[in-house]
């Protein structure tokens, strides 16, 4: 039955929940509104329809639904809930014709937070989707001297040229090196072929 999938997903959610509790971390989805409380956002940039790396979708925009999911987006509510029924119906839809309605999400520091479509993300992650289509708004923080912020601003420059969001660096200069590696001049835009070749190689 379709609830079998839900029960499997629930077990995965419960495992993640227990692991987080054991590490002293929150056992629920991250909430972007909470993260932004002390952040100065200087711009909102609509990115349009984006292929979002599933592993970069880490939370939800508002706190409304965040306790329904573990941090890995697996469900935590019991199988006899309306939530479980809706989740199972999405499974049906995914297996029959695929889930095509893009989610709505916010990007902050190259991580993504869902405004609409938490259950879709949950089902797609359960089926190990690599990318999830979403209409994305980027929230740009004020510049500061932290390493994370400086790397992010390098990413913003790179994204303008490459439109690639699945490469992460932990040191400064990585994106400029990557631009050279793809045989592009500083400031030169990538073509669709560049993107295809790179994703195949990556």
Show the residue positions of the predicted features.
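A short, basic-hydrophobic beta/loop patch
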Residues: 97-112, 118-151
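Short, charged/polar connector segments at secondary-structure boundaries
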Residues: 1-109, 115, 126, 171-182
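Solvent-exposed functional surfaces
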Residues: 133, 137-139, 143-202
